[in-house]
Amino acid sequence: MAVLGITVALLGWMVILLFISVWKQIHSSWNLPPGPFPLPIIGNLLQLDLKDIPKSFGRLAERFGPVFTVYLGSRRVVVLHGYKAVREMLLNHKNEFSGRGEIPAFREFKDKGIIFNNGPTWKDTRRFSLTTLRDYGMGKQGNEDRIQKEAHFLLEELRKTQGQPFDPTFVIGCTPFNVIAKILFNDRFDYKDKQALRLMSLFNENFYLLSTPWLQVYNNFSNYLQYMPGSHRKVIKNVSEIKEYTLARVKEHHKSLDPSCPRDFIDSLLIEMEKDKHSTEPLYTLENIAVTVADMFFAGTETTSTTLRYGLLILLKHPEIEEKLHEEIDRVIGPSRMPSVRDRVQMPYMDAVVHEIQRFIDLVPSNLPHEATRDTTFQGYVIPKGTVVIPTLDSLLYDKQEFPDPEKFKPEHFLNEEGKFKYSDYFKPFSAGKRVCVGEGLARMELFLLLSAILQHFNLKPLVDPEDIDLRNITVGFGRVPPRYKLCVIPRS
Protein backbone atom coordinates (compact mmCIF):
# COMPACT_ATOMS: atom_id res chain seq x y z
CA MET A 1 0.00 0.00 0.00
CA ALA A 2 2.85 2.35 0.89
CA VAL A 3 4.61 1.47 -2.38
CA LEU A 4 1.43 2.27 -4.32
CA GLY A 5 1.15 5.65 -2.59
CA ILE A 6 4.76 6.49 -3.40
CA THR A 7 4.23 5.42 -7.02
CA VAL A 8 1.14 7.63 -7.38
CA ALA A 9 2.98 10.56 -5.82
CA LEU A 10 5.94 10.11 -8.18
CA LEU A 11 3.64 9.88 -11.19
CA GLY A 12 1.84 13.04 -10.09
CA TRP A 13 5.15 14.83 -9.65
CA MET A 14 6.31 13.68 -13.09
CA VAL A 15 3.09 15.02 -14.66
CA ILE A 16 3.67 18.38 -12.99
CA LEU A 17 7.30 18.48 -14.18
CA LEU A 18 6.16 17.56 -17.69
CA PHE A 19 3.59 20.35 -17.62
CA ILE A 20 6.22 22.85 -16.45
CA SER A 21 8.59 21.72 -19.20
CA VAL A 22 5.93 22.02 -21.92
CA TRP A 23 4.80 25.40 -20.60
CA LYS A 24 8.35 26.76 -20.62
CA GLN A 25 8.91 25.43 -24.12
CA ILE A 26 5.77 27.08 -25.48
CA HIS A 27 6.46 30.29 -23.58
CA SER A 28 10.05 30.60 -24.80
CA SER A 29 9.33 29.55 -28.40
CA TRP A 30 6.71 32.29 -28.79
CA ASN A 31 8.58 34.94 -26.76
CA LEU A 32 5.36 35.66 -24.90
CA PRO A 33 5.14 38.48 -22.35
CA PRO A 34 6.14 37.38 -18.82
CA GLY A 35 3.60 36.33 -16.23
CA PRO A 36 2.89 34.09 -13.26
CA PHE A 37 3.28 30.35 -13.65
CA PRO A 38 -0.10 28.69 -14.37
CA LEU A 39 -1.39 25.48 -12.82
CA PRO A 40 -2.88 22.70 -14.97
CA ILE A 41 -6.56 23.21 -15.86
CA ILE A 42 -7.15 26.26 -13.63
CA GLY A 43 -4.29 28.39 -14.95
CA ASN A 44 -3.71 31.48 -12.78
CA LEU A 45 -7.15 31.45 -11.20
CA LEU A 46 -5.76 31.22 -7.65
CA GLN A 47 -3.73 34.40 -8.20
CA LEU A 48 -6.81 36.43 -9.11
CA ASP A 49 -9.45 37.90 -6.83
CA LEU A 50 -12.66 36.89 -8.59
CA LYS A 51 -14.48 39.68 -6.73
CA ASP A 52 -12.16 42.26 -8.31
CA ILE A 53 -10.14 40.91 -11.23
CA PRO A 54 -9.15 44.43 -12.43
CA LYS A 55 -7.41 45.05 -9.10
CA SER A 56 -5.61 41.71 -9.46
CA PHE A 57 -4.41 42.77 -12.91
CA GLY A 58 -3.04 45.96 -11.36
CA ARG A 59 -1.03 43.99 -8.80
CA LEU A 60 0.35 41.67 -11.49
CA ALA A 61 1.36 44.69 -13.59
CA GLU A 62 3.43 45.98 -10.66
CA ARG A 63 5.28 42.66 -10.64
CA PHE A 64 5.57 41.79 -14.35
CA GLY A 65 5.29 45.13 -16.11
CA PRO A 66 2.69 46.76 -18.38
CA VAL A 67 2.44 43.77 -20.74
CA PHE A 68 2.02 40.35 -19.13
CA THR A 69 0.49 36.93 -19.72
CA VAL A 70 -2.01 35.12 -17.53
CA TYR A 71 -3.94 31.92 -18.10
CA LEU A 72 -7.64 31.98 -17.30
CA GLY A 73 -8.19 28.26 -17.26
CA SER A 74 -6.54 27.07 -20.45
CA ARG A 75 -7.08 30.42 -22.20
CA ARG A 76 -3.94 32.44 -22.76
CA VAL A 77 -4.61 36.11 -22.06
CA VAL A 78 -2.24 39.03 -22.58
CA VAL A 79 -3.09 41.98 -20.32
CA LEU A 80 -2.06 45.54 -21.19
CA HIS A 81 -1.82 47.96 -18.28
CA GLY A 82 -1.10 51.67 -18.35
CA TYR A 83 -1.50 54.49 -20.84
CA LYS A 84 1.42 53.69 -23.15
CA ALA A 85 0.59 50.00 -23.66
CA VAL A 86 -3.19 50.44 -23.88
CA ARG A 87 -3.00 53.39 -26.28
CA GLU A 88 -0.44 51.66 -28.50
CA MET A 89 -2.64 48.56 -28.70
CA LEU A 90 -5.96 50.36 -29.33
CA LEU A 91 -4.66 52.93 -31.82
CA ASN A 92 -1.34 51.79 -33.33
CA HIS A 93 -2.24 48.08 -33.53
CA LYS A 94 -6.00 48.46 -33.93
CA ASN A 95 -6.21 46.07 -36.88
CA GLU A 96 -4.05 43.33 -35.33
CA PHE A 97 -6.14 43.35 -32.13
CA SER A 98 -9.57 44.07 -33.60
CA GLY A 99 -10.93 40.57 -32.94
CA ARG A 100 -13.42 39.93 -30.13
CA GLY A 101 -12.42 37.46 -27.44
CA GLU A 102 -15.15 34.92 -26.80
CA ILE A 103 -17.61 35.56 -23.96
CA PRO A 104 -19.39 32.19 -23.53
CA ALA A 105 -22.40 33.74 -21.78
CA PHE A 106 -23.14 35.47 -25.12
CA ARG A 107 -22.44 32.44 -27.29
CA GLU A 108 -25.89 32.82 -28.86
CA PHE A 109 -24.67 36.16 -30.28
CA LYS A 110 -21.39 34.69 -31.55
CA ASP A 111 -20.50 35.86 -35.08
CA LYS A 112 -23.63 38.03 -35.20
CA GLY A 113 -24.30 41.69 -34.45
CA ILE A 114 -21.54 44.20 -33.68
CA ILE A 115 -20.46 43.82 -30.03
CA PHE A 116 -19.76 40.09 -29.63
CA ASN A 117 -19.23 39.33 -33.31
CA ASN A 118 -15.83 37.92 -34.25
CA GLY A 119 -16.89 36.54 -37.62
CA PRO A 120 -16.53 37.69 -41.22
CA THR A 121 -19.69 39.84 -41.06
CA TRP A 122 -18.46 42.06 -38.22
CA LYS A 123 -16.65 44.79 -40.16
CA ASP A 124 -19.39 45.32 -42.73
CA THR A 125 -22.18 45.15 -40.13
CA ARG A 126 -20.42 47.68 -37.91
CA ARG A 127 -19.60 50.00 -40.82
CA PHE A 128 -23.14 50.00 -42.15
CA SER A 129 -24.61 50.38 -38.64
CA LEU A 130 -22.45 53.45 -37.98
CA THR A 131 -23.49 55.01 -41.28
CA THR A 132 -27.16 54.30 -40.56
CA LEU A 133 -26.93 55.69 -37.04
CA ARG A 134 -25.42 58.90 -38.40
CA ASP A 135 -28.35 59.14 -40.81
CA TYR A 136 -30.67 58.97 -37.80
CA GLY A 137 -28.82 61.72 -35.99
CA MET A 138 -26.37 59.85 -33.75
CA GLY A 139 -24.47 62.63 -31.97
CA LYS A 140 -26.16 65.37 -34.05
CA GLN A 141 -29.20 67.63 -33.89
CA GLY A 142 -31.65 64.76 -34.43
CA ASN A 143 -30.65 63.01 -31.26
CA GLU A 144 -30.50 66.22 -29.28
CA ASP A 145 -34.17 66.73 -30.10
CA ARG A 146 -34.97 63.12 -29.11
CA ILE A 147 -33.18 63.46 -25.78
CA GLN A 148 -34.81 66.82 -25.00
CA LYS A 149 -38.28 65.46 -25.76
CA GLU A 150 -37.66 62.41 -23.59
CA ALA A 151 -36.27 64.62 -20.82
CA HIS A 152 -39.72 66.24 -20.55
CA PHE A 153 -41.24 62.82 -19.81
CA LEU A 154 -38.51 62.09 -17.25
CA LEU A 155 -39.08 65.38 -15.43
CA GLU A 156 -42.82 64.65 -15.30
CA GLU A 157 -42.16 61.21 -13.78
CA LEU A 158 -39.87 62.77 -11.18
CA ARG A 159 -42.55 65.32 -10.27
CA LYS A 160 -44.99 62.45 -9.70
CA THR A 161 -42.81 61.21 -6.82
CA GLN A 162 -43.94 64.33 -4.87
CA GLY A 163 -40.72 64.43 -2.89
CA GLN A 164 -41.15 60.88 -1.58
CA PRO A 165 -38.32 58.29 -1.58
CA PHE A 166 -38.00 56.18 -4.74
CA ASP A 167 -35.57 53.79 -6.40
CA PRO A 168 -34.23 55.56 -9.52
CA THR A 169 -33.22 52.37 -11.37
CA PHE A 170 -36.10 52.14 -13.84
CA VAL A 171 -37.36 55.73 -13.68
CA ILE A 172 -33.95 56.97 -14.83
CA GLY A 173 -33.39 53.91 -17.03
CA CYS A 174 -36.52 54.46 -19.08
CA THR A 175 -35.10 57.67 -20.56
CA PRO A 176 -32.07 56.24 -22.43
CA PHE A 177 -34.24 53.16 -23.11
CA ASN A 178 -36.76 55.31 -24.99
CA VAL A 179 -34.10 57.35 -26.78
CA ILE A 180 -32.50 54.24 -28.29
CA ALA A 181 -35.93 52.63 -28.88
CA LYS A 182 -36.92 55.64 -30.99
CA ILE A 183 -33.79 55.17 -33.13
CA LEU A 184 -34.18 51.40 -33.46
CA PHE A 185 -37.97 50.94 -33.65
CA ASN A 186 -39.32 54.47 -34.15
CA ASP A 187 -41.19 53.81 -30.91
CA ARG A 188 -41.27 54.93 -27.29
CA PHE A 189 -42.80 53.37 -24.17
CA ASP A 190 -44.72 54.71 -21.22
CA TYR A 191 -42.64 54.66 -18.03
CA LYS A 192 -45.01 52.08 -16.56
CA ASP A 193 -45.17 49.89 -19.69
CA LYS A 194 -44.79 46.23 -18.66
CA GLN A 195 -42.77 45.25 -21.74
CA ALA A 196 -40.35 48.13 -21.24
CA LEU A 197 -39.92 47.33 -17.54
CA ARG A 198 -39.38 43.66 -18.38
CA LEU A 199 -36.66 44.43 -20.92
CA MET A 200 -34.93 46.90 -18.59
CA SER A 201 -34.99 44.32 -15.79
CA LEU A 202 -33.33 41.80 -18.14
CA PHE A 203 -30.64 44.34 -19.10
CA ASN A 204 -30.10 45.28 -15.46
CA GLU A 205 -30.01 41.70 -14.21
CA ASN A 206 -27.54 40.60 -16.88
CA PHE A 207 -25.21 43.52 -16.20
CA TYR A 208 -25.19 42.54 -12.53
CA LEU A 209 -24.83 38.78 -13.05
CA LEU A 210 -22.06 39.20 -15.63
CA SER A 211 -20.11 41.13 -13.01
CA THR A 212 -20.34 38.45 -10.30
CA PRO A 213 -17.51 36.00 -9.46
CA TRP A 214 -19.46 32.98 -10.73
CA LEU A 215 -19.73 34.42 -14.25
CA GLN A 216 -15.98 35.13 -14.25
CA VAL A 217 -15.47 31.44 -13.53
CA TYR A 218 -18.08 30.32 -16.06
CA ASN A 219 -16.72 32.45 -18.90
CA ASN A 220 -13.33 30.76 -18.51
CA PHE A 221 -14.51 27.21 -17.80
CA SER A 222 -17.72 27.04 -19.82
CA ASN A 223 -16.83 23.69 -21.39
CA TYR A 224 -16.91 22.12 -17.91
CA LEU A 225 -19.73 24.18 -16.41
CA GLN A 226 -22.28 24.78 -19.18
CA TYR A 227 -24.54 21.91 -18.09
CA MET A 228 -24.25 22.66 -14.37
CA PRO A 229 -26.76 24.78 -12.43
CA GLY A 230 -25.75 28.36 -11.78
CA SER A 231 -26.50 31.99 -12.60
CA HIS A 232 -24.92 31.58 -16.05
CA ARG A 233 -28.10 29.77 -17.07
CA LYS A 234 -30.13 32.83 -16.09
CA VAL A 235 -27.88 35.10 -18.16
CA ILE A 236 -28.19 32.82 -21.20
CA LYS A 237 -31.99 32.64 -20.73
CA ASN A 238 -32.18 36.44 -20.49
CA VAL A 239 -30.07 36.83 -23.64
CA SER A 240 -32.46 34.51 -25.49
CA GLU A 241 -35.51 36.45 -24.31
CA ILE A 242 -34.00 39.77 -25.42
CA LYS A 243 -33.18 38.33 -28.83
CA GLU A 244 -36.68 36.85 -29.17
CA TYR A 245 -38.12 40.31 -28.59
CA THR A 246 -35.86 42.07 -31.10
CA LEU A 247 -36.41 39.29 -33.67
CA ALA A 248 -40.18 39.73 -33.32
CA ARG A 249 -39.81 43.48 -33.89
CA VAL A 250 -37.58 42.87 -36.93
CA LYS A 251 -40.17 40.47 -38.41
CA GLU A 252 -42.96 43.02 -37.81
CA HIS A 253 -40.94 45.65 -39.63
CA HIS A 254 -40.19 43.24 -42.47
CA LYS A 255 -43.90 42.65 -43.10
CA SER A 256 -44.68 46.37 -43.33
CA LEU A 257 -41.43 47.49 -44.98
CA ASP A 258 -41.58 50.29 -47.55
CA PRO A 259 -38.06 50.54 -49.07
CA SER A 260 -38.80 54.06 -50.34
CA CYS A 261 -39.56 55.34 -46.84
CA PRO A 262 -37.38 53.83 -44.07
CA ARG A 263 -38.78 54.56 -40.63
CA ASP A 264 -35.83 53.67 -38.41
CA PHE A 265 -32.61 51.70 -37.94
CA ILE A 266 -34.32 48.31 -38.45
CA ASP A 267 -35.84 49.39 -41.76
CA SER A 268 -32.46 50.54 -43.04
CA LEU A 269 -30.90 47.15 -42.26
CA LEU A 270 -33.86 45.32 -43.83
CA ILE A 271 -33.53 47.36 -47.02
CA GLU A 272 -29.86 46.39 -47.17
CA MET A 273 -30.86 42.75 -46.58
CA GLU A 274 -33.26 42.88 -49.54
CA LYS A 275 -30.49 44.24 -51.78
CA ASP A 276 -28.21 41.43 -50.62
CA LYS A 277 -30.69 38.54 -50.67
CA HIS A 278 -29.48 36.98 -53.95
CA SER A 279 -25.90 36.79 -52.71
CA THR A 280 -24.46 33.30 -52.10
CA GLU A 281 -23.22 34.57 -48.71
CA PRO A 282 -25.73 37.23 -47.60
CA LEU A 283 -24.38 39.63 -45.00
CA TYR A 284 -27.76 40.37 -43.46
CA THR A 285 -30.34 37.90 -42.23
CA LEU A 286 -33.29 38.46 -39.93
CA GLU A 287 -31.28 36.75 -37.19
CA ASN A 288 -28.20 38.93 -37.66
CA ILE A 289 -30.30 42.09 -37.73
CA ALA A 290 -32.09 41.00 -34.53
CA VAL A 291 -28.76 40.47 -32.73
CA THR A 292 -27.42 43.82 -34.00
CA VAL A 293 -30.53 45.53 -32.64
CA ALA A 294 -30.23 43.64 -29.32
CA ASP A 295 -26.60 44.78 -29.03
CA MET A 296 -27.59 48.40 -29.57
CA PHE A 297 -30.60 48.15 -27.25
CA PHE A 298 -28.65 46.66 -24.33
CA ALA A 299 -25.58 48.88 -24.66
CA GLY A 300 -27.61 52.01 -25.39
CA THR A 301 -29.80 51.52 -22.34
CA GLU A 302 -27.81 49.91 -19.55
CA THR A 303 -24.50 51.79 -19.72
CA THR A 304 -26.08 55.26 -19.77
CA SER A 305 -28.70 54.29 -17.19
CA THR A 306 -26.10 52.90 -14.78
CA THR A 307 -23.84 55.92 -15.25
CA LEU A 308 -26.69 58.34 -14.49
CA ARG A 309 -27.79 56.30 -11.48
CA TYR A 310 -24.25 56.16 -10.12
CA GLY A 311 -23.83 59.87 -10.86
CA LEU A 312 -26.87 60.84 -8.80
CA LEU A 313 -25.56 58.77 -5.89
CA ILE A 314 -22.23 60.60 -6.10
CA LEU A 315 -24.01 63.97 -6.00
CA LEU A 316 -26.02 62.84 -2.96
CA LYS A 317 -22.66 62.17 -1.32
CA HIS A 318 -21.30 65.58 -2.37
CA PRO A 319 -24.01 68.27 -1.91
CA GLU A 320 -21.37 70.99 -2.30
CA ILE A 321 -20.81 69.85 -5.90
CA GLU A 322 -24.56 69.79 -6.55
CA GLU A 323 -24.78 73.37 -5.28
CA LYS A 324 -22.09 74.53 -7.73
CA LEU A 325 -23.93 72.79 -10.55
CA HIS A 326 -27.18 74.57 -9.62
CA GLU A 327 -25.37 77.91 -9.73
CA GLU A 328 -23.92 77.21 -13.18
CA ILE A 329 -27.25 75.94 -14.56
CA ASP A 330 -29.11 79.01 -13.23
CA ARG A 331 -26.52 81.35 -14.73
CA VAL A 332 -26.29 79.75 -18.18
CA ILE A 333 -29.68 78.10 -18.82
CA GLY A 334 -32.11 79.65 -16.39
CA PRO A 335 -35.21 77.99 -14.89
CA SER A 336 -37.34 77.16 -17.93
CA ARG A 337 -35.39 76.60 -21.17
CA MET A 338 -34.39 72.99 -21.86
CA PRO A 339 -30.60 72.44 -21.69
CA SER A 340 -28.93 72.10 -25.09
CA VAL A 341 -25.61 70.80 -26.38
CA ARG A 342 -24.44 74.31 -27.19
CA ASP A 343 -24.62 75.11 -23.45
CA ARG A 344 -21.71 72.74 -22.81
CA VAL A 345 -19.00 75.26 -23.77
CA GLN A 346 -20.41 77.72 -21.22
CA MET A 347 -20.77 75.06 -18.51
CA PRO A 348 -17.25 73.78 -17.81
CA TYR A 349 -18.13 72.61 -14.31
CA MET A 350 -21.04 70.43 -15.50
CA ASP A 351 -18.83 69.11 -18.31
CA ALA A 352 -16.11 68.28 -15.77
CA VAL A 353 -18.59 66.58 -13.41
CA VAL A 354 -19.98 64.41 -16.24
CA HIS A 355 -16.45 63.36 -17.22
CA GLU A 356 -15.44 62.77 -13.61
CA ILE A 357 -18.51 60.58 -13.01
CA GLN A 358 -17.45 58.37 -15.92
CA ARG A 359 -13.83 58.29 -14.77
CA PHE A 360 -14.65 57.63 -11.14
CA ILE A 361 -17.21 54.85 -11.65
CA ASP A 362 -14.95 53.13 -14.23
CA LEU A 363 -17.98 51.30 -15.59
CA VAL A 364 -16.21 48.63 -17.69
CA PRO A 365 -12.75 48.47 -16.06
CA SER A 366 -11.19 45.66 -18.11
CA ASN A 367 -12.87 46.57 -21.38
CA LEU A 368 -14.42 43.80 -23.45
CA PRO A 369 -11.84 41.18 -24.47
CA HIS A 370 -10.06 41.67 -27.78
CA GLU A 371 -8.36 38.94 -29.80
CA ALA A 372 -5.22 38.94 -31.93
CA THR A 373 -6.20 38.49 -35.58
CA ARG A 374 -2.65 37.45 -36.54
CA ASP A 375 0.74 36.81 -34.95
CA THR A 376 1.83 40.25 -33.75
CA THR A 377 5.04 41.70 -32.34
CA PHE A 378 4.16 44.11 -29.55
CA GLN A 379 6.76 45.91 -27.40
CA GLY A 380 9.32 43.21 -28.19
CA TYR A 381 7.02 40.27 -27.43
CA VAL A 382 5.16 37.99 -29.81
CA ILE A 383 1.41 37.67 -29.29
CA PRO A 384 0.14 34.66 -31.29
CA LYS A 385 -3.01 34.78 -33.40
CA GLY A 386 -6.09 33.86 -31.36
CA THR A 387 -4.68 35.16 -28.07
CA VAL A 388 -7.19 37.06 -25.93
CA VAL A 389 -5.93 40.60 -25.25
CA ILE A 390 -7.32 42.79 -22.45
CA PRO A 391 -6.55 46.53 -22.52
CA THR A 392 -7.37 47.67 -18.98
CA LEU A 393 -9.27 50.95 -19.16
CA ASP A 394 -9.12 51.40 -15.39
CA SER A 395 -5.33 51.74 -15.60
CA LEU A 396 -5.91 54.94 -17.60
CA LEU A 397 -8.88 56.29 -15.66
CA TYR A 398 -7.12 55.73 -12.33
CA ASP A 399 -3.61 56.80 -13.39
CA LYS A 400 -2.13 58.63 -10.38
CA GLN A 401 0.03 60.98 -12.44
CA GLU A 402 -2.80 62.11 -14.70
CA PHE A 403 -5.48 62.14 -11.98
CA PRO A 404 -4.00 62.91 -8.54
CA ASP A 405 -5.96 61.17 -5.77
CA PRO A 406 -7.83 59.00 -8.31
CA GLU A 407 -9.83 57.28 -5.56
CA LYS A 408 -11.51 60.62 -4.76
CA PHE A 409 -14.30 62.19 -6.78
CA LYS A 410 -12.83 65.51 -7.94
CA PRO A 411 -14.29 67.47 -10.90
CA GLU A 412 -11.01 69.41 -10.78
CA HIS A 413 -9.44 66.46 -12.60
CA PHE A 414 -11.01 67.99 -15.72
CA LEU A 415 -10.60 71.70 -14.95
CA ASN A 416 -7.56 73.91 -15.49
CA GLU A 417 -6.39 76.64 -13.13
CA GLU A 418 -8.77 79.13 -14.74
CA GLY A 419 -11.77 76.85 -14.17
CA LYS A 420 -12.11 75.95 -17.85
CA PHE A 421 -12.70 72.40 -19.03
CA LYS A 422 -9.50 70.40 -19.51
CA TYR A 423 -9.59 67.30 -21.71
CA SER A 424 -7.41 64.29 -20.85
CA ASP A 425 -6.20 61.75 -23.41
CA TYR A 426 -6.36 59.21 -20.57
CA PHE A 427 -10.16 59.51 -20.61
CA LYS A 428 -11.19 56.39 -22.53
CA PRO A 429 -14.36 55.00 -20.87
CA PHE A 430 -15.74 54.09 -24.31
CA SER A 431 -12.48 52.41 -25.35
CA ALA A 432 -10.86 53.44 -28.67
CA GLY A 433 -9.82 52.07 -32.04
CA LYS A 434 -11.75 49.53 -34.11
CA ARG A 435 -13.91 48.38 -31.20
CA VAL A 436 -14.77 51.79 -29.77
CA CYS A 437 -18.37 52.04 -28.56
CA VAL A 438 -20.57 52.98 -31.54
CA GLY A 439 -22.88 54.96 -29.26
CA GLU A 440 -20.23 57.17 -27.64
CA GLY A 441 -21.60 60.40 -29.12
CA LEU A 442 -25.16 59.59 -28.07
CA ALA A 443 -24.15 58.59 -24.53
CA ARG A 444 -22.06 61.73 -23.97
CA MET A 445 -24.97 63.87 -25.12
CA GLU A 446 -27.48 62.03 -22.93
CA LEU A 447 -25.36 62.32 -19.81
CA PHE A 448 -24.87 66.08 -20.20
CA LEU A 449 -28.45 66.94 -21.17
CA LEU A 450 -30.26 64.65 -18.73
CA LEU A 451 -28.14 65.47 -15.69
CA SER A 452 -28.49 69.19 -16.49
CA ALA A 453 -32.27 68.87 -16.87
CA ILE A 454 -32.70 66.98 -13.60
CA LEU A 455 -30.64 69.49 -11.61
CA GLN A 456 -32.29 72.44 -13.36
CA HIS A 457 -35.63 71.43 -11.84
CA PHE A 458 -34.80 69.47 -8.67
CA ASN A 459 -32.71 69.36 -5.54
CA LEU A 460 -31.46 65.90 -4.62
CA LYS A 461 -32.16 64.73 -1.09
CA PRO A 462 -30.54 61.62 0.45
CA LEU A 463 -32.28 59.41 3.00
CA VAL A 464 -29.17 59.29 5.18
CA ASP A 465 -26.38 61.66 6.13
CA PRO A 466 -24.18 62.24 3.04
CA GLU A 467 -21.15 61.09 5.01
CA ASP A 468 -22.81 57.69 5.49
CA ILE A 469 -23.37 57.13 1.76
CA ASP A 470 -21.17 54.31 0.48
CA LEU A 471 -20.08 54.75 -3.14
CA ARG A 472 -18.34 51.40 -3.41
CA ASN A 473 -19.65 49.09 -6.12
CA ILE A 474 -21.40 45.91 -4.96
CA THR A 475 -19.56 43.73 -7.48
CA VAL A 476 -17.06 44.15 -10.30
CA GLY A 477 -16.37 41.90 -13.27
CA PHE A 478 -17.89 42.62 -16.67
CA GLY A 479 -18.71 46.02 -15.16
CA ARG A 480 -18.88 47.90 -11.87
CA VAL A 481 -22.37 47.68 -10.39
CA PRO A 482 -23.49 50.54 -8.11
CA PRO A 483 -25.35 49.84 -4.87
CA ARG A 484 -29.14 50.05 -4.91
CA TYR A 485 -30.46 53.12 -3.14
CA LYS A 486 -33.42 55.45 -2.81
CA LEU A 487 -33.52 59.23 -2.93
CA CYS A 488 -35.96 62.12 -2.94
CA VAL A 489 -36.12 64.83 -5.58
CA ILE A 490 -37.47 68.16 -4.35
CA PRO A 491 -38.74 70.69 -6.93
CA ARG A 492 -36.68 73.87 -6.93
CA SER A 493 -38.64 77.02 -6.20
From Swiss-Prot:
On whether Endoplasmic reticulum is a keyword of this UniProt record, the answer is yes
One of the record's GO cellular component terms: mitochondrial inner membrane
What does the record give as cofactor? heme
Q: Does the keyword Protein transport apply?
A: no
Recorded catalytic reaction(s): these are: an organic molecule + reduced [NADPH--hemoprotein reductase] + O2 = an alcohol + oxidized [NADPH--hemoprotein reductase] + H2O + H(+); (5Z,8Z,11Z)-eicosatrienoate + reduced [NADPH--hemoprotein reductase] + O2 = 19-hydroxy-(5Z,8Z,11Z)-eicosatrienoate + oxidized [NADPH--hemoprotein reductase] + H2O + H(+); (5Z,8Z,11Z,14Z,17Z)-eicosapentaenoate + reduced [NADPH--hemoprotein reductase] + O2 = 19-hydroxy-(5Z,8Z,11Z,14Z,17Z)-eicosapentaenoate + oxidized [NADPH--hemoprotein reductase] + H2O + H(+); (4Z,7Z,10Z,13Z,16Z,19Z)-docosahexaenoate + reduced [NADPH--hemoprotein reductase] + O2 = 21-hydroxy-(4Z,7Z,10Z,13Z,16Z,19Z)-docosahexaenoate + oxidized [NADPH--hemoprotein reductase] + H2O + H(+)
Binding locations of substrate: 298-303
Q: How is its activity regulated?
A: The omega-1 hydroxylase activity is stimulated by cytochrome b5.
User: Could you tell me the Gene Ontology terms of the biological process aspect for this record?
Assistant: epoxygenase P450 pathway; xenobiotic metabolic process
Can you tell me which residues bind heme?
Answer: 437
Query: Cross-referenced InterPro entries, in alphabetical order?
Result: Cyt_P450 (IPR001128), Cyt_P450_CS (IPR017972), Cyt_P450_E_grp-I (IPR002401), Cyt_P450_E_grp-I_CYP2E-like (IPR008070), Cyt_P450_sf (IPR036396), Cytochrome_P450_fam2 (IPR050182)
Subcellular location(s) of the protein: Endoplasmic reticulum membrane; Microsome membrane; Mitochondrion inner membrane
Record's note on what induces expression: By ethanol.
Regarding the membrane, this protein is recorded as: Peripheral membrane protein
* Chief site of localization: endoplasmic reticulum
Enzyme Commission (EC) number: 1.14.14.1, 1.14.13.n7
**Enzyme class, spelled out:** oxidoreductase
Q: Record's family?
A: Belongs to the cytochrome P450 family.
Subunit details = Interacts with chaperones HSP70 and HSP90; this interaction is required for initial targeting to mitochondria.
Indicate what this protein is called per its UniProt record.
Cytochrome P450 2E1
Species, as recorded: Oryctolagus cuniculus
